[in-house]
């Protein structure tokens, strides 16, 4: 399996799960993923695991998984990509975090004008220890992903 620095050709599936999405995972099969790996021969595949909405598209143990999930697609992607020797990376929305901001308004980033940003989280609060680090450990430990791309921090950081 190629390391990221050895990779050139990759695929990014930019699905940001929301709580109103229905039947997540219902139609994805191992054969679908295997066909992608065998026909396109990517060095890596990157899929979404937590989008800007703050909901995960896999059954996270940390309480922010979308409610209508029919299949653990992350396990499916990991199983097949391991068998096909393709690295698997995650898309993870970092400071752009609508769900956590809504549930913990005191943790929102403070802007230049003294007001809190509606959807951007501060990194010197509880978020890093309560969600970010535990979720990254969950992805590395339970799913054995090859890496994570943290999205939003350069253009959503306040």
What are these regions (language model features)?
Residues 90-145, 152, 157-158:
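Active-site-adjacent "subsite" loops/lids of carbohydrate-active enzymes
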Residues 71, 75, 84-85:
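Trp-centered recognition loops
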Residues 32-36, 40, 73, 77, ...:
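Alpha-helical packing segments of well-folded alpha/beta enzyme cores
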Residues 13-16, 48-50, 91-95, 150-153:
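Active-site-proximal beta-strand/loop segments in catalytic clefts of secreted hydrolases
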Residues 12-28, 56-72, 114-133:
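The substrate-binding groove and active-site-proximal loops of carbohydrate-active enzymes
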Residues 33, 38-73, 96-108, 113-116, ...:
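Aromatic-lined carbohydrate-binding/catalytic grooves of carbohydrate-active enzymes
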Residues 81, 85-88, 92:
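Hydrophobic beta-strand scaffold residues
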Residues 1-52, 86:
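N-terminal structural segment of carbohydrate-active enzymes
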């Amino acid at each position: 399996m190629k390391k990221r620095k050895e990779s050139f050709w990759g695929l990014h599936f930019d699905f940001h799960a929301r709580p109103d999405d229905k039947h997540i995972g219902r139609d994805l099969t191992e054969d679908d993923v295997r066909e992608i790996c065998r026909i396109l021969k990517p060095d890596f595949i990157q899929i979404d695991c937590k989008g800007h909405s703050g909901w995960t598209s896999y059954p996270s143990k940390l309480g922010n998984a979308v409610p209508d999930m029919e299949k653990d697609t992350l396990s499916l992607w990991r199983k097949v990509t391991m068998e096909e020797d393709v690295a698997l990376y995650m898309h993870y929305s970092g400071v752009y975090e609508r769900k956590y901001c809504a549930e913990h308004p005191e943790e929102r980033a403070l802007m230049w004008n003294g007001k809190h940003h509606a959807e951007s989280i501060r990194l010197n609060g509880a978020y890093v220890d309560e969600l970010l680090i535990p979720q990254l450990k969950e992805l590395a430990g339970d799913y054995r992903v090859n890496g994570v791309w943290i999205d939003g921090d350069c253009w959503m950081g306040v």
